[in-house]
Amino acid sequence: MNWLLRKCSKCGRYTLSRDRCPYCGGELIVPHPPRFSPIDKYVEYRLEEKLSKGIIKLDEKPPYKP
């Protein structure tokens, strides 16, 4: 999808320019989040990455006890 709005990574201002920020000359990024899909093709890769970095640990007991 072709987004028009851009955000400067340096100063945080929004602009319609596509190359550089007209205020500070910083790099522009697309501020829109990625589309959500219930059929996620990359969930396995994200889970594997989080497990390898130790963000998620599957061997721990959950804190909730019914």
Curated annotation (Swiss-Prot):
Top-level division of the source organism's lineage: Archaea
GO molecular function, one term: snoRNA binding
Record's keyword annotation contains Ribonucleoprotein: yes
Single GO biological process annotation from the record: rRNA processing
UniProt KW keywords: Ribonucleoprotein, Ribosome biogenesis, rRNA processing
GO cellular component, one term: ribonucleoprotein complex
Presence of the UniProt keyword rRNA processing in the record: yes
Gene3D superfamilies: H/ACA ribonucleoprotein complex, subunit Nop10
NCBIfam families, A to Z: PRK13130.1
Protein family membership: Belongs to the NOP10 family.
Function: Involved in ribosome biogenesis; more specifically in 18S rRNA pseudouridylation and in cleavage of pre-rRNA.
Name of the featured protein: Ribosome biogenesis protein Nop10
